[in-house]
C-alpha cells in the first residue's frame, strides 16, 4: 500500500491537483506493480507565508 506525499506552494488549480493525483498514481502503479486502488496520494499545499528559502518567505518575494 504505497503512500506518496507531495508538498507544494499554494496557487495550483483544482484541475492541476486532480491531474497530479491521477498521473502520480499511474507512475507508481506501473513502477511498483501495485493496484491503483491501493495507492494513496497526499497533497500538502503550503501558504506562501508559511514557507521560506534563504531566510525569506515566499510571500515576500
Swiss-Prot record:
Catalytic site positions: 2
Keywords: Isomerase
Listed InterPro entries: 4-OT, 4-OT-like_dom, Tautomerase/MIF_sf
Coiled coil: none
GO MF term list: isomerase activity
One Pfam entry name: Tautomerase
UniProt-listed Enzyme Commission number(s): 5.3.2.-
Gene3D superfamilies, sorted: Macrophage Migration Inhibitory Factor
NCBIfam families reported for this sequence: PRK02220.1, taut
Sequence similarity: Belongs to the 4-oxalocrotonate tautomerase family.
Protein name: Probable tautomerase LMOf2365_2536
Species of provenance: Listeria monocytogenes serotype 4b (strain F2365)
Amino acid at each position: 500500500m504505497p503512500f506518496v506525499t507531495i508538498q507544494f506552494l499554494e496557487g495550483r488549480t483544482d484541475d492541476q491537483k486532480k491531474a497530479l493525483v491521477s498521473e502520480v498514481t499511474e507512475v507508481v502503479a506501473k513502477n511498483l506493480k501495485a493496484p491503483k486502488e491501493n495507492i494513496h496520494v497526499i497533497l500538502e499545499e503550503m501558504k506562501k507565508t508559511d514557507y521560506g528559502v534563504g531566510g525569506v518567505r515566499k510571500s515576500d518575494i
